[in-house]
Each structure stands twice: as structure tokens, then as C-alpha cells.
Amino acid sequence: MKQLFEGSITKVHGIRVGQAQNDAAKTGVTVVLCSHDGAVMGADVRGAAPGTRETDLCKPENTVERVNAVVLSGGSAYGLDSASGVMRFLEEHGAGVDMGVCKVPIVPAAVLFDLKVGDAHVRPDAAMGYEACEKAGKEVRQGSFGAGAGATVGKLIPGTVPAPSGVGTASITLGCGVTVGAIVAV
């Protein structure tokens, strides 16, 4: 199969990606870390039961214009806890919106339902989110890694066997020199 877009979201200046997972439990987290000044983010929240945290901040009418990281996590609603570890990592590194008394890292998050794939009692948590930050770099493993560790598609139709899916990323550099990147967990 021919790739439509080569590259990854890390081709965008200042973007690094970290992934951590529990292979036995088939769940994990993918973290997109932005440069120290943050980045403008857009989100399209879909699905019959979306699980998100702070994605409303990304709407253009809101006052927060930049995010410091984005979390994609397995574990359904439990996986939102992984964003707390990302916030701790960013706070330790001085990133966030300066509120005068402290900096508050802005970390939108979205989750996948992977509880029926591996061990439903092992979920991405703050420690796994922090670990993903520590592993952040320019290489992004695609497929069943990080948030994609237990990702599947085809679960809505009774009697069908879900198929493995995962994390994917791509980027394109436009003629004007601007690079646009994306990352998804499906």
C-alpha cells in the first residue's frame, strides 16, 4: 500500500512524541509534547461515547490559545488519569500558562476503549503518562504502540471480531515551507 503522506507529526518544529504501554495488559499512552511556548491545537471529538479532558479549551472562542501537550490514551475514562502525569512532568520542566502563583500546563486528552482487549484492571495512569514524557523524541512507533497497544476497530456490530488498529502519524511540508502534521489513535 502506498503512503499518501510520509513523515510524522514530529517533522513539525518543536514537537516530540513519547509512548509507554503495558504489553501484557494491551493498553498504553501516547503523548505529544510541544515546544516550551506551546502550540495551537485543534480537536474533532467524535464517537458514541467520547472520553476527553480539556478539549473544549481548543475552541477558538476560548482564551487559552496554546497547549503544552496532548495525550492519547487507552483505558477508556480511566486513561484520562495519564494526563495528570504529563502535567507533573511539564510543571517540573517549567511549562504552562503563567498564573502568577504557578504555571498550569495545558494538556488536552482523549481516550480509546480497549478494556475488553487485555487486562481491564490495568490502565494507563499518571505514572504511565510521566513515563511517556520521559521517552519523548522524534521517532514515533506506529501501530500497536502507546495508545494503540490495545486499539481495535469493528466493535459495534454484534458477532463480529474486532480487528487491531493503532496509532498513525503523517506530515506534509507545503510549498510555502509550512509543515503540517497529524497523529491519530483509532
Language-model segments: residues:
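Alpha/propeptide regions of enzymes that mature by internal proteolysis
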Residues: M1-V186
